[in-house]
Amino acid sequence: MIIGYARVSSLDQNLERQLENLKTFGAEKIFTEKQSGKSIENRPILQKALNFVRMGDRFIVESIDRLGRNYNEVIHTVNYLKDKEVQLMITSLPMMNEVIGNPLLDKFMKDLIIQILAMVSEQERNESKRRQAQGIQVAKEKGVYKGRPLLYSPNAKDPQKRVIYHRVVEMLEEGQAISKIAKEVNITRQTVYRIKHDNGLS
């Protein structure tokens, strides 16, 4: 059986392209993950897919970084599939799916390619994080870094959350207890404390 696995790192990303790609390569069953886990253990759908595959199956992913967040995780997943005698197919790397000729050389080359790709993938991820941190630092120095938009604020996208924000400010100004406010408007005490701090309310 041909099993596909697709993952996007956030709910905002489009999953359709990956799904179409996997179907093009004959995936009969596709597992999809719409969350970003910091480790394989935090990717329940990947775990489910790996548990599902059986000896003789083919496991398809679009790129090697779908198999793990770093070099060790990728190699661990690859070895897990090997132990189960499941063929791994990476659609973005056609040569991985071609037989070189000599079985021993074939195995050696593919193992080597996977190790190199896993290492490069981890380096690219680290470099991306470094550039992001550098960009944030520059933005902070220029006074233009805004950070993530606040869920409850006077400028919140959701009008209902703007109403809640103003209600919290009103209750704080009335001197009501943090726990009472949090319970009444159904938000966390940490959020109430943050709104209190942002408004300079003692």
From Swiss-Prot:
It comes from the Bacteria. Belongs to the site-specific recombinase resolvase family. It comes from Staphylococcus aureus. It holds the Pfam family HTH_7. The active site is at residue 9. Residues 1-143 form the Resolvase/invertase-type recombinase catalytic domain. SMART domains: Resolvase. One of its GO terms (biological process) is DNA integration. InterPro entries: Recombinase_CS, Resolv_N, Resolvase-like_N_sf, Resolvase_HTH_dom, SSR_resolvase. This is Putative transposon Tn552 DNA-invertase bin3. One of its GO terms (molecular function) is DNA strand exchange activity. The gene is bin3. CDD domains: SR_ResInv. Keywords: DNA integration, DNA invertase, DNA recombination, DNA-binding, Plasmid, Transposable element, Transposition. Potential DNA invertase.
